[in-house]
């Protein structure tokens, strides 16, 4: 589908959202574009500096959302890069069952829509940045890419891409034993960062954090791990 950030469907409470997550507001030399895709399913936000040297698409991690990437957004803007972010299905402000996913191709399909939006409305070259699951989505997009079409990204930058999670063998075994009668489990907030204040914010202050994790994500992860292991060698440079 053709995804376009639609100014006719603004994000309710956007100013409060930006303040709460300490994201850059619009200024005289910084344009902020925010809205939903045409199907109203996905929230998209873009920051464009007065002089732009290219556009970065940021793909967030599992159970993350745009609001948690303020430091990265500001760093990219300081480099005169336009930043385009979106909340994946079931994450942040986007619609869908919280964090439920049957196949990573659902995330890749939405990424393709965002790429089309960037190519139509923002300056090139185009760069991809992916954190954890977001890194996996960018890799899957790369290995599934049709070589007849020019590859859209000038660079790929992956931050701890999700390729084989810690404790995966046990998680996988438990999933296949219980998937027919356990559809979600209580979320355990792990020490995923050295920043204790950030971890405390996730646990007790961020209203967009899910408290339960759908078990279907394990099945989707299992499919992805198998696909990655069996994929052909690719010489594209990744940073």
Predicted regions and their residues:
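An N-terminal hydrophobic leader/cap segment in hydrolases
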Residues: 1-36, 40-48
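Short beta-strand element of the alpha/beta-hydrolase
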Residues: 53-61
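Catalytic nucleophile-loop/oxyanion-hole region of alpha/beta-hydrolase
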Residues: 62-68, 92-122
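Conserved alpha/beta-hydrolase
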Residues: 73-97
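Alpha/beta-hydrolase-fold enzymes
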Residues: 129-217
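Active-site nucleophile elbow and catalytic-triad environment of alpha/beta-hydrolase enzymes
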Residues: 213-236
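Short beta-strand/loop motif that positions the catalytic acidic residue
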Residues: 239
């Amino acid at each position: 589908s053709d995804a376009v950030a639609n100014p006719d469907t603004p994000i309710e409470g956007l100013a409060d959202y930006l303040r709460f997550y300490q994201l850059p507001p619009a200024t005289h030399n910084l344009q902020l574009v925010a809205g939903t895709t045409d199907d109203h399913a996905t929230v998209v936000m873009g920051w464009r500096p007065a002089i732009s040297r290219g556009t970065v698409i940021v793909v967030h991690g599992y159970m993350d959302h745009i609001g948690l990437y303020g430091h990265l957004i500001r760093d990219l803007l300081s480099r005169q890069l336009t930043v385009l972010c979106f909340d994946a299905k079931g994450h942040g402000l986007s619609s869908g069952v919280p964090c439920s996913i049957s196949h990573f191709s659902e995330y890749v399909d939405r990424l393709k829509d965002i790429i089309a939006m960037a190519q139509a409305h923002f300056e090139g070259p185009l760069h991809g940045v992916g954190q954890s699951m977001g890194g996996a989505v960018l890799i899957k997009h790369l290995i599934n890419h049709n070589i007849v079409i020019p590859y859209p990204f000038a660079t790929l930058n992956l931050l701890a891409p999700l390729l084989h999670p810690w404790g995966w063998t046990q998680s996988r075994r438990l999933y296949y034993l219980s998937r027919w009668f356990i559809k979600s489990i209580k979320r355990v907030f792990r020490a995923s960062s050295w920043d204790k204040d950030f971890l405390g914010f996730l646990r007790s202050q961020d209203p967009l954090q899910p408290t339960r994790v759908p078990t279907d994500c394990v099945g989707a992860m299992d499919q992805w791990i198998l696909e990655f292991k069996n994929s052909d060698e690719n010489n594209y440079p990744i940073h």
